[in-house]
Amino acid sequence: MLIGALAAAVTAIRLTLHVLAATVWVGGQIVVAGLLPTIRSLGPDAGKAVARALARLQWPAYAVLLLTGVWNVAATRAGQPHTWQVVLGVKIGVVLLAGLAAYVHQRTASRRALAVWGAIAGVASLAALVLGVVLAG
């Protein structure tokens, strides 16, 4: 009985950390995209300042997503059907693409590249979120 309650508590912690990190990672991108016109109106350096501040929140959240994602796979993968495993593989690829695109977006200087890599990061992050919901059933 105690072991079952402890296992349920650990599962709740694992899933809460994962969802909270996804909220910060994906939600931050959505919020900044919506605020971009206002941010740009604040001056030429406002966008960079907001990006630096957001990065201080988002990169730790991305790390938590990766760690809890591995934890989730270890806790739930056994006995899952082949289609679940395929969706998981696609999700892992999309998560890595989202991180890579966000990293390139953060490092680029051209406005066009910022738009392209930001869009790729945003779409990949949303796709990873949807695939996570699919995997959760």
Name each model-derived stretch:
Residues 1-137:
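Polytopic transmembrane helical bundles with strong interfacial aromatic enrichment
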